[in-house]
Amino acid sequence: MGLIWLLLLSLLEPSWPTTGPGTRLRRDAGGRGGVYEHLGGAPRRRKLYCATKYHLQLHPSGRVNGSLENSAYSILEITAVEVGVVAIKGLFSGRYLAMNKRGRLYASDHYNAECEFVERIHELGYNTYASRLYRTGSSGPGAQRQPGAQRPWYVSVNGKGRPRRGFKTRRTQKSSLFLPRVLGHKDHEMVRLLQSSQPRAPGEGSQPRQRRQKKQSPGDHGKMETLSTRATPSTQLHTGGLAVA
């Protein structure tokens, strides 16, 4: 009888943990690809490197494009708005990545609903960023946007560094795949210079140095006047034309 009970327990054992991991997978992955459920708090400073070899950058003028070089406008702050939904802000431009109702990417000077993107993990290890507000049906690019539409509009940069319109994008295209890169040494230097230049008040720190240089200049007429007023004739020692108290 003891052997029979052991066999029954061994058959029931594998079924116990299946409910836990199964629910975990369904909670972490919504539809295709995974969702960053753990994000929140402080923003992540990253560079979004597209599979087309361009870094996504946001300009102060509101333009969005890709850059092959090390640009300060490609340093971004990715902040979690909700579970799987992020807002992308340019650190140096101060603008938010946004997509309008025509599927065009632009850099907005203020945060709005067009600045929210659904961040998902692609099977190849890249990330995709789809507009949370706009999407289209499966009937074609010219279809009207519907609340129950299925195909999202993705952030995309083509092989020439130009953004593609949302209704022309697919999640499997190289132009829609981005790899969040950690900032390098040069990027950290630019961020440090930006942070150190912001809190400084205008006109402070540089004037005292200039005043010291003016006082230390030899042969200055103003210096001779100050020395003559401070020193008395009885305590002056003349060496080489300079008065020392």
From Swiss-Prot:
GO terms for molecular function: growth factor activity. Coiled coil: none annotated. Residues 1-17 form the signal peptide. It comes from the Eukaryota. SMART domains: FGF. It holds the Pfam family FGF. Glycosylated. Gene3D superfamilies: 2.80.10.50. SUPFAM superfamilies: Cytokine. Glycans are attached at N65. Residues 137-181, 195-245 are annotated as: Disordered. GO terms for cellular component: cytoplasm; endoplasmic reticulum; Golgi apparatus; nucleus. Residues 161-173 have a biased composition (Basic residues). The keyword Nucleus applies. GO terms for biological process: cell differentiation; fibroblast growth factor receptor signaling pathway; organ induction; otic vesicle formation; positive regulation of cell division; positive regulation of cell population proliferation; post-anal tail morphogenesis; semicircular canal morphogenesis. Transmembrane segments: none annotated. PANTHER family: FIBROBLAST GROWTH FACTOR. Plays an important role in the regulation of embryonic development, cell proliferation, and cell differentiation. Required for normal ear development. Interacts with FGFR1 and FGFR2. Affinity between fibroblast growth factors (FGFs) and their receptors is increased by heparan sulfate glycosaminoglycans that function as coreceptors. This is Fibroblast growth factor 3. The lineage of its organism: Eukaryota, Metazoa, Chordata, Craniata, Vertebrata.
